[in-house]
């Protein structure tokens, strides 16, 4: 005899064969996703962790190639051809683009929050310590901000349960938006009677707004923000308080003031309603004090406090005045951004 032999009554659970990563790794229809999971992106390490639960949205090679993504083995590089204009991107830029999309297809779901997609909801993608972007679902269709721009969705065409979560097979990508959040705000304000109309009307006439591309000064593509938009009644309230230009008696706004001092009031008001570098929602994931785009008279940062819990989202200004989100008209997706409608305005005082 040269050793001992022990029998077991349970197979050792390997991360590679019992996790949502397995759904891609063991199926030749998903070689492109598997390649980027394994190329040092850290995605494999995330989704193969059987001690945490995830939901994975998995596009096949056919889906990826149909939307312009492929890997050139002869050149050892990723390649992307835009389905819209045929523009070709290769190398690290193409890889980064696909990596962003596939990271938004990974969602930390410790309580199985996405096991039933027949209803509707919004959730943050990525793992808990490295947030992705917010995505939505409705009646077994999943959307990113880019899908809303393109007018499509990723449909669920099947699923597979693993030890650490569920894999959904999808017929489209969960796309990110390449438009300025100003475009999304403009679209929200467009319908007759829109509650975003008053705020947007001040914005589009302000020094912060560039009609070419609907760009907002200080708001850069690819950076996280939260837009806190007072509804029409809150804007009227701000006018009556002299916080915004208009008739202080009737509350009728003057969206395009001629005096420089009033123009500055508008610009500062708008900046204070945009949280910089953070995206917050009514999910309890982020709370505390967050920087806004506004600077004080000394050029220092200003802050707004955020209270967040399941179904709760409140913004509090320096004077301790609060603005509560309006659930039916909040959590609108934009580029790494959420746009919320609130029932009050925020005011910075020095």
Model-derived features with residue positions:
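Mature, structured domains of secreted/extracytosolic soluble proteins
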Residues: 1-350
